[in-house]
A protein has these predicted regions:
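Non-transmembrane, amphipathic alpha-helical segments
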Residues: 16, 23, 48-55, 83
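Amphipathic alpha-helical segments in structured regions that serve as interaction surfaces
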Residues: 20-32, 59-71, 87-95
């Protein structure tokens, strides 16, 4: 019950800066359009048990780096826990789109 209340509270009281959210949405589009670059990077490590996990890790890492960097650049501070929670929700919103990408 309390999780439901907190989750709904977080949905209606967005604190993530709109500029940061815009940058992240663009970075998601950019990452999904640069599959060839990421695939080349993944393949440069030779035989991997699961290249998709590594490729998705690269994308998530790029997005996390952008989130953190833009928070520091635009807001002049580290992101708050609530902003980080909104970042996670943004990733979940694009989860299917990101998981459809294959790097093998």
């Amino acid at each position: 019950m309390i999780f439901h209340i907190l989750f709904n509270y977080n949905q209606y009281n967005k604190v993530m800066d709109e500029k940061i959210q815009k940058v992240l949405e663009e970075k998601i589009r950019e990452s999904t359009s640069k599959i060839n670059e990421i695939t080349t990077l993944v393949n440069s490590f030779g035989q991997m048990k699961n290249p998709n996990v590594f490729g998705h890790g690269i994308i998530i890492g790029r997005l996390y780096n952008s989130f953190y960097y833009q928070s520091r650049r635009i807001l002049k501070r580290n992101p708050t826990e609530q902003e980080f929670s909104e970042f996670i929700q943004l990733l979940k919103k694009h989860e299917n789109e990101l998981l459809e990408i294959s790097f093998s």
